[in-house]
Design a protein with these regions (language model features):
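Metallo-beta-lactamase
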Residues: 25-44, 51-55, 68-82, 107-117, 132, 146-199, 239-255, ...
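Pre-active-site segment of Zn-dependent metallo-hydrolases
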Residues: 86-133, 171-173, 179
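Short hydrophobic/aromatic beta-strand or adjacent loop that forms the aromatic wall/cage
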Residues: 84, 97-99, 198-202
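Active-site metal-binding motif and surrounding structural segment of the metallo-beta-lactamase
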Residues: 118-159
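N-terminal juxtadomain amphipathic helix
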Residues: 25-92
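Short, Lys/Arg-enriched N-terminal segments with co-localized hydrophobic residues
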Residues: 15-23
């Protein structure tokens, strides 16, 4: 086949290396975005996808590498408010979440990770002062956390200890925190909520939303498509609900905090105002639904 563009040639060369296994590659699961330690061939399975909270696609497990992703995908950026930038991959890859870059006078924090880290992203973040640390909400968003740490001088990556068994690439950059709260910087605190995963975490930014406070909830507390309510799930794709006890624990973790705005896990999943009261009412609605309140509605 004749290649007419340089990009097609680069893609063909990348495919050839991937298929022949001539170099050790750190393979990435195409379904969940998790990167595995370098190996001659793709892993036989992805435990993250085999768990009931995720899934193996109908066409089966498939794998890629960071090098291949850099050819076929790119990252885009969105300024949400002063000091907060969303970073997401186009076209959509794996789960499709976006990361958040939080810029503060005390230092910058990357909240959650996406699989693709490219030159444009590194340049943007370095231009804004680099990273003080990375913090991740739960195992579905661990992705290429080691690559992100290395790109910014081996910054620490903070994960809740309750989810330690899900780490696929053990590394010195990983720092496990325990308990219910962990202060990353002045005014930036990790909150343990549990729910989706035992170590499910959220981030509270006291100065966000013009000083009213922001919670970055990932999919521990999911901003629904109507942006008027929250959902809480053990598995989102497989529609496995949480218990009332687990959902009330998420609400109880957040209620003592001052916040008016919530950023969930995708670009459009934002509760711009009134989020604290809406979260409170969403917890009660969930409890009522689990208890049978809507059985005859």
């Amino acid at each position: 086949m004749r290649l007419t563009r340089a990009g097609e040639l680069v893609r063909a060369l990348a495919d050839a290396v991937f298929q022949t296994g001539e170099t050790m590659s750190a393979f990435i699961c195409s379904a969940c975005g998790t990167q595995y330690p370098p190996s001659d061939a793709p892993p036989a399975q992805c435990p993250v996808c085999e768990d009931e909270r995720q899934y193996i696609p109908p066409e089966g497990q498939s794998w890629t590498t960071l090098e291949r992703l850099r050819i076929s995908h790119h990252n885009g950026f969105r300024q949400y408010e002063p000091g907060l930038i969303g970073i997401g991959t186009q076209p959509k890859f794996a789960i499709g979440q976006r990361a958040l870059l939080l810029c503060t006078p005390e230092g910058n924090i990357l909240w959650d990770c996406i699989s693709l880290i490219d030159d444009a992203t590194i340049t943007l973040i370095n231009g804004l002062g680099g990273l003080h640390a990375i913090a991740i909400s739960h195992p579905h968003f661990y992705t290429t956390l080691v690559e992100w740490s290395r790109a910014f001088g081996d910054v620490p990556v903070h994960l809740h200890a309750n989810d330690a068994k899900w780490v696929r690439q053990p590394d010195r950059c990983i720092k496990f925190w325990q308990g219910e709260r962990f202060e990353l910087l002045k005014g930036v605190t990790l909150i343990h909520g549990g729910g989706h995963f035992p170590g499910g975490s959220m981030l509270h930014w006291a100065a966000g939303a013009e000083g009213k406070g922001v919670v970055c909830s990932a999919d521990i507390a999911i901003v629904n498509l109507d942006r008027k309510s929250f959902a809480f799930m053990r598995s989102i794709p497989n529609h496995i609900p949480l218990s009332e006890k687990a959902v009330r624990a998420i609400g109880a973790a957040l209620m003592p905090l001052a916040f008016d705005r919530v950023y969930s896990h995708h670009f459009e999943r934002v509760m711009h105002s009134g989020a604290k009261q809406i979260l409170r009412s969403s917890v009660e609605r969930y409890a009522a639904a689990i208890g049978g309140a809507y059985d005859r509605a």
